[in-house]
Amino acid sequence: GEEVAVKLESQKARHPQLLYESKLYKILQGGVGIPHIRWYGQEKDYNVLVMDLLGPSLEDLFNFCSRRFTMKTVLMLADQMISRIEYVHTKNFIHRDIKPDNFLMGIGRHCNKLFLIDFGLAKKY
């Protein structure tokens, strides 16, 4: 009975990217702030990616905080954001979709840890 996040993509999608994204997560596994992938496969008419459940995005938090963060919050978040992006770069990939919606806070014992998600547009360099 553990809660997880499930990302679905129609197998009829014009530009399928979930298989590619699942392979990228496998390359990045073990990095701080990279969600753990539980399973990738096909079910009925869908490609399915199952990963650890995470908390709110930076966009969600920014809205919750009336679109104002303290300097301390900005600096603490920026430090983690830069670290996540640098880690992706050490694996010779660029994310190509950096935005507040793609940075999520962890939950439980990881509630102060920032995670980077959505590698569907990432490219090797």
UniProtKB/Swiss-Prot annotation:
It catalyses: L-seryl-[protein] + ATP = O-phospho-L-seryl-[protein] + ADP + H(+); L-threonyl-[protein] + ATP = O-phospho-L-threonyl-[protein] + ADP + H(+). Its main location: cytoplasm. The keyword Nucleotide-binding applies. Residues 1-125 form the Protein kinase domain. ATP binds at residue 7. It is found in: Cytoplasm; Cytoplasm, Cytoskeleton, Microtubule organizing center, Centrosome; Chromosome, Centromere, Kinetochore; Nucleus speckle. Keywords: ATP-binding, Cell cycle, Cell division, Cell projection, Centromere, Chromosome, Cytoplasm, Cytoskeleton, Kinase, Kinetochore, Mitosis, Nucleotide-binding, Nucleus, Phosphoprotein, Serine/threonine-protein kinase, Transferase, Wnt signaling pathway. GO terms for biological process: cell division; intermediate filament cytoskeleton organization; protein phosphorylation; Wnt signaling pathway. It is an enzyme of class 2 (transferase). The active site is at residue 97. One of its GO terms (cellular component) is kinetochore. The keyword Metal-binding does not apply. Its EC number is 2.7.11.1. It comes from the Eukaryota. Phosphorylated by MTOR in response to mitogenic stimulation, leading to its activation. One of its GO terms (molecular function) is protein serine kinase activity. Pfam families: Pkinase. Interacts with the Axin complex. Interacts with TUT1, leading to TUT1 phosphorylation. Interacts with FAM83A, FAM83B, FAM83C, FAM83D, FAM83E, FAM83F, FAM83G and FAM83H (via DUF1669). Interaction with FAM83H recruits CSNK1A1 to keratin filaments. Belongs to the protein kinase superfamily. CK1 Ser/Thr protein kinase family. Casein kinase I subfamily. Casein kinases are operationally defined by their preferential utilization of acidic proteins such as caseins as substrates. It can phosphorylate a large number of proteins. Participates in Wnt signaling. Phosphorylates CTNNB1 at 'Ser-45'. May phosphorylate PER1 and PER2. May play a role in segregating chromosomes during mitosis. May play a role in keratin cytoskeleton disassembly and thereby, it may regulate epithelial cell migration. Acts as a positive regulator of mTORC1 and mTORC2 signaling in response to nutrients by mediating phosphorylation of DEPTOR inhibitor. This is Casein kinase I isoform alpha. The gene is CSNK1A1.
